[in-house]
Amino acid sequence: MIPTSKGKNTKTQPPLSRMTRDELEDSLFRLREEHMLVKELFWKQQDEIKRMRTALLRLTASGRGLRAEAAADESSGSPLNGGGTESGGTAPSSTSVPRCPGSSCSSSAWAPLLPAAPSLASTRDTDSSTPPGHRAEKPKRESRDRLSYTAPPTFKEHVTNEKARGEVASEPSELGHLMTSDTMQVEEPPKSPEKMWSKDENFAQRSSLESTQKATELRASIKENIQLIRLKKLLHERNTSLAVTKAQLTEVQAAYETLLHKNQGILGAAHNALLSQVNELRAELKEESKKAVSLKSQMEDVSILQITLKEFQERVEDLEKERKLLNDNYDKLLESMLDSSNQPQWSHELGEQLQQKVSQLQDQLDVEMKEKREILLQLSQEKAQNKDLELEVTSLLQKHKQEVEDLQNISTFSQSPDRQSAPATHPALFQETIQIQPCEPKNQEEKKLSQMLSELQVSHAETTLELEKTRDMLILQRKINVCYQEELEAMMTKADNENKDHEAKLERLNQLLDLKNKRINQLEEQLKDVAYGTRQLPLCLKPLPAHENEDKVDISPWHQSENLFELHIHQAFLTSAALAQAGDTQPTTFCTYSFYDFETHCTPLVVGPQPLYDFTSQYVVEIDSLFLHYLQGASAQLDLHQAIASEHHTLAAGWICFDRVLETVERVHGSATLTGTGGEVFGVLEYWMRLRFPIRSSLQAYNKRKKAQAYLAANVLGAWEAQKDEPRSGTWKNQNELRVEIIRCCGLRSRSLGAQPSPYVMYRFFTFSDHDTTIIPASSNPYFRDLARFPVLVTSDLDQYLRREALSVYVFDDEDSEPGSYLGRVQVPLLPLAQNKSIQGDFNLTDPVGEPNGSVQVHLDWGSCYLPPENFPKPEAQSEEDTRDGLETSIEEEEASFPPQDQMVSIDTPTEAGQYQAKRKPPQVGERKEREHQVAGYSRRKHGRKTGLQGKNRMEYLSHNLLNGNTLQQVKYIEWKFSGLKISADHVLKNQQKEEEMTSSYSAQILKETPHPVNDKEFCEQASEGSEAQTTDSDEIVTPVSQKCPKADSEKMCIEIVSLAFYPEAEVMCDENVEQVYVEYRFYDLPLSETETPVSLRKPRAGEEIYFHFSKVIDLDPVEQKERRQFLFTMLIGEDPEQGHLKFTVVSDPIEEEKKECQEVGYAYLELWPMLVSGRDILEQDLDIVGPEDQATPIGKLKVSLQAAAALQAIYKEMTEDLCS
């Protein structure tokens, strides 16, 4: 009956998916109203049935009484017979009366008999007037006529079984017929009392059996009808919910289609953008190639310029020769200039004529010069003769005067006194006569001499005039020569400038060409690495065969690294247990499943115990390592749901594994067992899956694409790279720049077999931050070409660092998630740098086990010539005030001119250069007490689509290996050191600073420095403050500012907590309350906040070791920290409660969410007396950890280091001497 009803509903009912919401609501309200009407009609008919039943019982009782009276009258009115008849006639009535209420105890049981109840009532009403033959058919006819009116028209289609409906309607008619026949038999006159008695008994028995049988059949039919009505109502409700579900499904499908179209549009736009980017990159490559060609052409032009430069040099030499000719022929040029002043401008012909004239004038000038020389010689001779004549004349005059004087003297002695007047006059006359007599020849000679003198004067005047003319000519020639010389110098200067410009341009072009060649080589190497360095996975996949009936898929917009994964859900076979659980032999089911990171897919609804879904999901995936790991190890859950109207519930679930799809490119068929919630098997689901394209080529294309993107990101080349750095100011002569270039690595092997590493290089130079290169994905021979520049001040500390230390270069694998692991490590010695030599070559890498693992090519060189600090010239001594002023001025100039010492410039990755710059200021005199510790944190980088994996080994490595005895434990270098500055003797402090190290082969090295001239007390205060606050842990390195008053080994001690591990059999490993632990120790007056590890680490697993790397430097100054020294002495001699050992306590630290107190887990003891006896520091010694209760059984080991041998010996010696004295 149910399938027929369902089929009828399917034909007449309109499709619910096409009905609107308003129509559905109207139909719902209409059905609700019809339901209320039917319910009211049902209660009315039930009340009517009750009334009819009471009337029927009364009529039955009255009919039997009438039959009994009639029988008594006919049998002669015997009281015995009448009593027997009455008792016999009422017996069936008494048995049937209580049965009738029992059959109608439930109101719902009479609901199917509603059409028959009025017919019974009408039969009883017409008992007395209607003949028996007609009474049997009237109820049946009326029941059939009223059957179609007992329910609303909507439910007519649900009544499909006419036979069952006729039986239900005919049963009351037969009952009425039996009752009328009984009445007819009662009305017949009995013939005899015994016969009537037997007939009554037979009739009562027969009627009771028949009534019992009829009542049973009626009850069964009523139950079936009730069940039928319930099923129809349930079917109607499920149809309604199914319609709602279909409507929702259509809405979801429409939304999914719109979202799919939108996503496809977005993917298309993204693909177009990628294509445009590729085109742009190609265009840029073409432009770069054009630039390279242009540079080559420029190089050819440069060669031409070199030829022209040589020609220009030859011209300069010719000009030098011409200059010499001009100096030799200045007279000719003078005359030519004088003659050319009255002539028009020179031409080529006039130039030749003038040259001829100049040559003639030069000849004339030579002749005149010869004549002038002869005249000058004659003039000199005549002057000499004239001088001789003058000497002769002067000598003659003197001789003549002498003779005259002699004569006068003689005359005076010969004359007498009386005759004195006469002789006095006589000599005068005599003298005149004497004078007159020789004057005549003398006058003649004088005339000759005067005549010769006049002639000589005339010739001398002429010569002087000629000489003045010559001098003027020479002066003019000098001026002309000066003009020519200035012009020549200007031309030479211009030529030199042009030559320098050409040389600078040539050098610039050479630099650009070298840079371009380097860039081309880098791109070639990277292209080779991308094209040939990406290995294929060892997957043996055959090419996909062509299927004729296969859906065509458009793969034009896909990338080479993408693939199409298909998952087909074929058919499910449900067991009888599943059908029983579903409660239906024809259940409506569908499947849901999700794959990778895509959305959940749903199959269509299918009806039947063996639903055939035939549904295929297609996923466009990118073949990478994550997807391969998913296919190899993951499985997807498939849920089987049963749909009931608008609701559904999960019937069973199964799992689909994808590992076999990697073995072939054909369809991989499989079956999943469907299990219920209780674990019972509900059936089997068949499916198949495949990859449309070979996975090996897709994975290789993905690795190539990823590697190319990494190279493109690393090869950002700024315009400033080609510019040559301008020379810095010469304020400080001891500044330099170190260039460290990581070129490439070769032959790297990953720790995972069959995989390629994603390497990057990391190193630290001097006091600078850690520098790391870019990450090259999936490459065994990465080409980095990473250049970092470190500006430094050449000090004694730097020189000692270069001579004693080596540059530790580490190569990490970004794909390796194990903490503390690296691919390779190498120590590059820096001694050649201290000798002003460069370092270049391939260095072999060794893994943590010590096995070789490839090589790294590095190049280190100086930007300028390196001079050791002792070779720098020292300025002269100055006064105290001048020195202080000069120091302040030089510090300010240094701040303005010299960049910070820890600044690094990365050439190939300028965008990341700022990540490793730490802001440092030069120390000022008034701010030395305000210095704080600088914390250098190691940051991680992210690459590709993964988050949190890229660069994660750096912090873990530095907490595991970098500080674990392989490199510098703590760096204490001075930022600003003025080693070449000599100040007055009162303010110069010569101290030594010890550089503390924790290495496997040696303990400490001493570095020299020349600090600033500041008060010793301030230095010591700052040193004590800095030493007490120096701590390191597993994630940080605390680097204090340099101490200006470094402590000696005998004035400090360093305690380091390295690592912690528990034994697997220890009770603490099973204690769930212990989740995090830290380590502490007590030392005299130090608070626990300074002697406990700053962070709590999770409890180590079995066989695992956790690293703290917490160090503490304790000041043991003999003057300021006497109590601490006394405390250590009491520990050594055994008077302290600690009994000569240092006690470490391992404490459990509860999680913040749990409000619990810390509890002590174990203790470790470090003996001090053996260190005092041996005189050696303890480096990473394992101490047994014992429990707080059982002090005999170790539960783990604690690795610590203690540098206090020198301090303990000094304290013991000092205290024993004090005790003895």
Curated annotation (Swiss-Prot):
GO biological-process terms attached to the record:
non-motile cilium assembly; visual perception
Q: Tissue expression, per UniProt?
A: Retina, brain, skeletal muscle and kidney. Colocalizes with RGPR in the outer segment of rod photoreceptors and cone outer segments.
Q: Residue ranges of the C2 domain? A: 723-843
The listed locations are:
Cell projection, Cilium
Q: Does the keyword Electron transport apply?
A: no
Q: Which domain of life is it from?
A: Eukaryota
Q: Where is the composition biased (Polar residues)?
A: 1-15, 88-97, 903-914
- Point to the regions of Basic and acidic residues compositional bias: 134-147, 155-168
Gene Ontology CC, one term: photoreceptor connecting cilium
> Which residue stretches, if any, does this entry annotate as coiled coil?
267-533
Tell me the segments the record calls region Disordered: 1-22, 68-107, 119-196, 869-947
Segments carrying the region annotation (Interaction with RPGR) are 1027-1216
Keyword Coiled coil in the entry? The reply is yes
According to its UniProt record, what is one Pfam family this protein matches?
C2-C2_1
Keyword terms of this UniProt record: Cell projection, Cilium, Coiled coil, Sensory transduction, Vision
Please describe what this protein does: May function as scaffolding protein. Required for normal location of RPGR at the connecting cilium of photoreceptor cells. Required for normal disk morphogenesis and disk organization in the outer segment of photoreceptor cells and for survival of photoreceptor cells.
Domains as described in the record: The C2 domain does not bind calcium ions, and does not bind phosphoinositides.
Q: Which family does it belong to?
A: Belongs to the RPGRIP1 family.
Q: How does it assemble?
A: Forms homodimers and elongated homopolymers. Interacts with NPHP4. Interacts with NEK4. Interacts with RPGR. Interacts with SPATA7. Interacts with CEP290/NPHP6; mediating the association between RPGR and CEP290/NPHP6.
What is the protein's given name? X-linked retinitis pigmentosa GTPase regulator-interacting protein 1
Species name: Bos taurus (Bovine)
